[in-house]
Curated annotation (Swiss-Prot):
Its EC number is 1.1.1.25. Pfam families: SDH_C, Shikimate_DH, Shikimate_dh_N. GO terms for cellular component: cytosol. Pathway: Metabolic intermediate biosynthesis; chorismate biosynthesis; chorismate from D-erythrose 4-phosphate and phosphoenolpyruvate: step 4/7. One of its GO terms (molecular function) is NADP binding. CDD domains: NAD_bind_Shikimate_DH. The keyword NADP applies. The active site is at residue 66. Coiled coil: none annotated. The gene is aroE. This is Shikimate dehydrogenase (NADP(+)). Keywords: Amino-acid biosynthesis, Aromatic amino acid biosynthesis, NADP, Oxidoreductase. It catalyses: shikimate + NADP(+) = 3-dehydroshikimate + NADPH + H(+). It comes from Lysinibacillus sphaericus (strain C3-41).
Amino acid sequence: MKKWFAVIGDPIEHSKSPAMHNAWFEEMSVEATYIPLHVSSEQLGAAVAGLKTLGASGWNVTIPHKTAIIPYLDELDELAQKMGAVNTVVRTTEGKLIGYNTDGVGFVRSLEEAVGSSHKDKPVLLVGAGGAARGIAFAMQQQGYSDLTMTNRTVANAQAIVDEMGIGRAISLKEAEETLAHFSIIVQMTSAGLATGNFSMPFSLNRLAKGAIVADIVYNPLMTPFLQAAEEKGATIVTGLGMFVHQGAIAFEHWLGDYPNTNSMIVQLNAQLGGN
């Protein structure tokens, strides 16, 4: 019987996940299909019950359901539990629903694919304190990045993650701007304002260190205002596309046991999104 998978969210129209997973199914001769499902917050419980009843083998979860879905699941893996957020659900052969979060590990794989894995002792500045920030901070810590600093408009939110995870320290945006030259890797983890065109830089990059690596988790647009400003300062930039592809590939592996070809997918999506 043909397996089927989905992505649930609100909005969902612009998701690249269906095209990505269906291309992988075809490439790997997997009898499966992947569909986008628009699910509002009010419909979430009914949607999970429906997915289960209709025999979905698994699904991805996007905004705004990553935390709200947790009560409907039977188990969480350690990373999802630590983050309090789920982006991948696996339905076991016994019908159990297990929640995973592949965002943080997907980011680390993307970063190391772009710049190598020899930067683990370098000072890292993480900008933002939302769900994505929590996952990336935890995954970087797990993967051996030992010098992490978080900054956020509301410092208390960054401090809460630092305290909970026992990582580094939290500083204000003002201090981040003043001490920017100290950091070798800067990761921009907020998407506020991008969709509406009201994005404002969290701080000036005038003090950016020569040879710094600057990453953004947003993949559409590929060149965010933050990355544009960093590139003008001579930084090595890492777009959010690699993270998107790798988090999807890790989900694919949870569902089917094989890791798909991420390189060709990054090239393909890069062309679609107008990259070089």
